[in-house]
């Protein structure tokens, strides 16, 4: 639903926003719904992420010009932030400075989290395959 007269857009993140993970060659253990376009966001981005139990995103990433905040909705995760591994549980929030490399690994029950970011340049992200290896 878009209401230009009232200045808002309403979307259901699971019903109205397509899982983009397959479009980026990601395995079925990752479900990534990027809602910026669906919501008509100009500078604010929102993503709904679901990772299967024990799945680790196969790359680290950072942004040159934007902060991000992740909020765990269900399950648990470990996040490698630069050289530190941080444990997260339900309703934990973590903020990343720009230029901070990170990667997520789901806990034993999987994890569902929201990622919030500000910025509108897709070239802002840097991804490093295999960044978090044991």
What is the predicted role of each segment?
Residues 59, 79-80, 96, 102-108, ...:
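Short beta-strand His + acidic residue motifs that chelate non-heme Fe in jelly-roll/DSBH
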Residues 36-38, 58-63, 105-106, 130:
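Short histidine-centered beta-strand/loop micro-motifs
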Residues 48-52, 62-80:
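Short, conserved beta-strand element in jelly-roll/cupin
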